[in-house]
Amino acid sequence: MRTWRIKHLNLAALTAYELIKEENLTDIHAKGYLLRHKKSGAKISLISNDDENKVFYIGFRTPVEDSTGVPHIIEHTVLCGSDKFPVKDPFVELVKGSLNTFLNAMTYPDKTVYPVASCNDKDFANLMDVYLDAVFHPNIYKKEEIFKQEGWHYELEDKDAPVTINGVVYNEMKGAFSSPEGVLDRVVLNSLFPDTTYSNESGGDPEVIPELTYEQYLDFHRKFYHPCNSYIYLYGNMDMDEKLEFLDKEYLSHYDKIEVDSVIQLQAPFTKPVTISKPYSIASSESLEDNAYLSYNVAIGTNLESELTLAFDVLDYALLSAPGAPLKQALIDAGIGKDIMGGFDNSTLQPIFSVVAKNANKEDEEKFVGIIEDTLKKIVKDGLNRKSLLAGINSEEFKFREADYGNFPKGLIYGLSCMDSWLYDDDEPFLYLKILDVFTALKQKIETGYFEELIQKYLLDNSHKSYVSIEPEKGLNAKLEKELEEKLAAYKKSLSEEEIDKLVEDTKHLKQYQEEPSPKEDLMKIPMLKRQDMKREAQPLVYEKVSCNGIETIHTNIYSNGIHYLNLMFDISDITEEELPYLGVLKAVLGYMDTEHYNYADLANEINLMTGGISSQINIYADTKKKDSFHAKYEVRSKILYQNLEEGLRLLSEILMRTQITDEKRLYEILARIKSRLQMSLSSAGHSVSAMRAMSYFSPVARFNDLVGGIALYRTIAELEEHFDEKKQFLMDKLRSLAEKIFVKNRLLISLTADTEGYQLLEEKFPQFLTVLPDGEKEGEAVAFQCEKKNEGFLDASKVQYVSRAGNYLSAGYSYTGALRILKVILSYDYLWINVRVKGGAYGCMSGFMRNGDAYFTSYRDPNLKSTNEIYEGIPAYLRAFDADERDMTKYIIGTVSDMDTPLNPAAKGMRSVSAYLTNISYEELQRERNEVLDAQPENIKNLAGLIEAVLAQDALCVIGAEENVEAEKDMFLEVKNLY
């Protein structure tokens, strides 16, 4: 058992603050304090524990009165220089030159939050200082160019050219408004709260953003960015007294308390539901039929009622999210929508419960509402499935106790959950960190009719509802673009010759401003660590290769809080290209169809009662020593408490060996759902999808990934769904034969993350699992993939592009070195950032260099296409002229080390172990790479120009983007085709 060290505040010495409350936050092994700064009125919550991954944020309540996106533009622009740190982009300087474990800023419908995290004390203090100066003393009052660059501006490079609009936030929101799910979410929020801040789009509506003036934008900052409207949060193992003294002396003591009217207002309940319908744009190739979204939305109490909120998280599972959940099943059985989504969202003062039917038809709206309400009435009368409720509670409780938030520091997630109550009650930051007792209470209420009463009161008898539909319209984006062109042409026509000349001059001036680097003396003001502050040792690989009951096992022997992270990895390296997409289907089938002993709904409940989740993944591990050699694995991952291991293994064998792939109706439902979810991911992650596709033209690894999770998988799924009746028998036979071939002892590798006790338990309990697993045949020779350069342009109903270029440097005779890790930082946050984002207006730009030689450059929500590709082609010249001084090199090195040293939770440490084993990389090689990073000189970067030239010479290009923009540049592609 671990002991938790907590440093107590010296409150007597902190005379600038008054203590509002202190609490033992035993659920998260911490002590919580709520303070108020006496002079400024700032609110501060502290969570003190022994977590070295320290977190700070400052947030502001930022309600809006229109959809110009002013809080979003401020979020971008305050990080573009300040009094103490006048460089043009301190945010990027920190990304490149700090050991941050998190660094970002986020705009919500009612708040704006600026969080940072770091494990290094000195670095953490630097990050705090830069962020505090940014929000309180930004350069936005001195330089209107910042507003124009990040928000919006008219652009006219030549007096005879048409006027256009550009700006990072403007283009980001054009991308956001291209997604039907994004459109629906906005309309739902607006529909339920028409008299509050939520009736507007805080991120900005692209049609409205250009109405925002520079003065209105500054007024918003003046009004809301005052300490008395702020929420300051500190978390982790640090000297809290020192941080509070710093806050007071450097910032808060300079302000006097004022009144800021920012209270988030409650929406008065409706007397009857409202019905709203809006259009969304689809590509000309897409069908109008089965393409509407229908939604049923209800406002549920307030976020200050933690038991109600957690009860609705459980109801979300029991009614809607779980496989076979009654609301979802009733709609699917009635043929309304092919994918049922929705759920419970408590990110606003009044949370929302939604049921959404995707791939539906507008004429079914009345039937949709009727089925939901009839089903709910029946549930209230007959009672909910008790096991579903208990499984829902167990699932939420497991997640809270485990506190595994992937790459996000848990202190950040705790801090954001503080805001779920604190923003609406200044005295209540810790409400959602004290919930284990609530879970206990909810378990006790399962048999009392409590959950059925909630359904009656909040879903059936509650008239605060909206029925929102969004309907497909072909060419809507093109129509809106044409209207904008006409509006801009009329605007230009209204200008005098002098005004046109001034606009050309302003455009030129902004470009000059963007191209001018920050003065050296300003850059020197950004605090930075030194090379010698970097730890020289690479993170150790803490695994051992052992035999568990005769099965090769990679055991990562670390403390895991009594949880087995068990990964059963079956080799699929010999599965053919034709068969691989069917593994993508199998992944969605296992655990979601009936088995010998359970129907699929009961199986889901059993999984959530006995484990922290069981899921399938398909991964490929490229061998770092042999080109085009790899290990492909079908992975069944589980999280099982030590005391539940026997039950967990029983469920794993039930899923792998006893799934009955015979239910045609259920199989079709699963196919339709995969198709729907893939559509969403192809659109929302267009940058990574297009990069993967570009690499698939030459890379076996990327070709594999595309077949099991990219555009190639989508095409197979769409074909199967469309011709299901004639293909269903073939599909069921194929899935069964693949399962029989793969799930055998001779293909199995185990990855276990747990301590010695956990390993011994597995050794003891695993023989029973092995008795049902046939020996089978060992995998055959790995498949040789047929890669073919296609250079595709995919047409989408988007307003922006995702532009990807790729190649392989190993095939051109170059090798992987630590310098490539630094190059990724330099390109992503210098060359590409300045050219693609700052000047080009794209929301994002990235690059990547894999050990197997695959390399890519990609853009995200990019208004451009051809010019972005030309920017990629300029990289070699940029590198040949690269001449960083020692400070700049150190900065790039720190940013690289920051990425290499991201703190890992137990599950991630286990994945790192097995990945190193399968990719054939040793600790010595990791150490050599780290040395190459820490000792890098400018010459090492300059020398990469030839490597990049070789990558670009392979000319692998893939773009996903707006129909008219891709068509306009069709000569760049070998093929232009519809994405869907």
Where are the language model's segments positioned?
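M16 family metallopeptidases and their MPP-like homologs
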Residues: 53-63, 89-137, 144-155, 182-207, ...
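Non-catalytic, conformational "gating/processing" segments within enzyme and secreted inhibitor domains
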Residues: 218-250, 731-766
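His/Glu-based metal-binding/catalytic segments typifying zinc-dependent metallopeptidases
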Residues: 48-50, 57, 170, 174-178, ...
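Hydrophobic, small-residue-rich alpha-helical packing segments that form membrane-like cores
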Residues: 158-227, 233-251, 255-282, 290
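Extended, domain-scale alpha-helical bundle/helix-rich regions
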Residues: 447-486
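Aromatic-residue-lined binding/catalytic grooves and analogous aromatic/hydrophobic interfacial grooves
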Residues: 452-454, 462, 720-732, 736-742, ...
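Active-site His/Glu-centered metal-binding helix of metallohydrolases
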Residues: 70, 74-78, 586
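Non-catalytic terminal extensions that flank enzyme cores
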Residues: 2-55
